[in-house]
């Protein structure tokens, strides 16, 4: 049953423009960071440093762009039937709405990871073209790990926003606005050692290894993200009760 729901939801996404929006936003992040890399520091361009592009793109994308895109994608999937007035027709079919919502969240999680891996692929290709010989296997694998864990962690961090917007039924574009404010606030949270440990968006960086964090900070980050997941599930549970 869950497999069929995942397949059906993936087919709906393939027919929508939301994936193109997500892909375009990811490519634009790469282009913007590449342009920033042309600036010089002591007569040396940032882009000339091996690994700089992969590192800079990851942080800029997380603070400014990708959480909002992922939140938009997730809330779009959940709100789509409501917005397009097809929910009543869907209820004529014996579909478990709780499982359907869970399938949408799982698919949004998968796309969150894929979006970050797409950004990694873009940055790695640029790094390989510019200075292949300077790249070590360890550096590439470390960045791959960071991007992958960011994709996982960012989805967990913003899952309450996706669930809340779905509960509010005010339009999935609100998720983009809320997530943008939420992720941008991470810049200010990162200035404080205490806030950096407990704020969900920066806790992701502690877990992924982007920040130099000790084991205690990593464990706190895991707990914070688990709280976000539990909160989103509670909100979605209320959503399904409301729609019955």
What does each model-identified segment do?
Residues 77-109:
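Helix-loop-helix units of permease transmembrane domains in multi-pass membrane transporters
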Residues 17-19, 96-98, 102, 139, ...:
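Membrane-helix interface segments
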Residues 70-74, 122, 160-161, 200, ...:
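Hydrophobic/aromatic residues in alpha-helical transmembrane segments
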Residues 28-66, 70, 102-168, 208-212:
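Secretory targeting signals
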Residues 17-40, 58-73, 114, 175-186, ...:
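Hydrophobic alpha-helical transmembrane segments of multi-pass membrane transport/permease proteins
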Residues 9, 13, 91, 159-170, ...:
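Generic transmembrane alpha-helix motif of multi-pass integral membrane proteins
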Residues 35-54, 172, 176-244:
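Terminal transmembrane helical anchor/hairpin motif
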Residues 1-26, 170:
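Aromatic- and glycine-rich beta-strand/loop motifs that create alpha-glucan
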């Amino acid at each position: 049953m869950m497999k069929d729901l995942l397949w059906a939801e993936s087919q709906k996404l393939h027919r929508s423009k939301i994936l193109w929006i997500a892909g375009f936003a990811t490519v634009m992040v790469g282009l913007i960071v590449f342009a920033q890399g042309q600036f010089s520091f002591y007569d040396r361009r940032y882009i000339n440093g091996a690994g700089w592009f992969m590192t800079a793109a990851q942080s800029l994308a997380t603070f400014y762009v990708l959480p909002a895109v992922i939140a938009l994608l997730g809330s779009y999937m959940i709100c789509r039937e409501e917005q397009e007035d097809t929910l009543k027709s869907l209820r004529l079919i014996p579909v478990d709405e709780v499982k359907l919502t869970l399938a949408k969240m799982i698919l949004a999680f998968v796309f969150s990871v894929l979006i970050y891996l797409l950004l990694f692929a873009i940055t790695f290709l640029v790094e390989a073209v510019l200075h292949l010989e300077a790249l070590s296997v360890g550096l590439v694998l470390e960045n791959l790990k960071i991007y992958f864990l960011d994709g996982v962690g960012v989805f967990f961090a913003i899952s309450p926003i996706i669930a809340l917007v779905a509960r509010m039924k005010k339009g999935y574009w609100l998720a983009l606005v809320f997530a943008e404010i939420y992720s941008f606030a991470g810049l200010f949270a990162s200035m404080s050692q205490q806030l950096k440990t407990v704020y969900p968006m920066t806790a992701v960086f502690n877990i992924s290894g982007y920040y130099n964090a000790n084991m205690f900070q990593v464990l706190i980050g895991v707990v914070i993200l688990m709280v976000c997941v539990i909160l989103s599930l509670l909100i979605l549970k209320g959503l399904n009760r409301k729609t019955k």
